Amino acid sequence: MANPERIDVMVCLATVTPPKLVQVQVSATATVADAVRASGLLEEVGLSIDACRLGVYGKRKAPDALLHAHDRVEITGPLIADPKAARRRRVRRVRATGTREGLKWLRNEAPPEDDVAG
């Protein structure tokens, strides 16, 4: 018979390494942070709970959010690359190819000299 004071939750660590899943049993009043600590996954990879984003079924949650039975707690690591810098690199790469696709970002700039009628 199941203990009504304990619930089963799944904790998933999603970083650059392959994801790791651990099933833990926590108290019925446990928070997201309690489940993460009980899983021991952060100690394995050397991360702190403050450096990670936490969520339940893909929705971001605060560490003090309460859990329900059979929830899946997700731990995502910090971003490796700055999204703005990555986008700038992609745009620069497309512009360098000289294709029409690369020109759509240049609307407010003068057209290239070879396109000017003369």
From Swiss-Prot:
A matching Pfam family: Ub-RnfH
SUPFAM superfamilies with a match to the protein in the record: MoaD/ThiS (SSF54285)
Classification via InterPro entries: Mopterin_synth/thiamin_S_b, RnfH, RnfH_sf
Annotated family: Belongs to the UPF0125 (RnfH) family.
PANTHER family recorded: UPF0125 PROTEIN RATB (PTHR37483:SF1)
Alphabetized HAMAP family for the sequence: UPF0125_RnfH
Name assigned to this protein: UPF0125 protein RSc1426
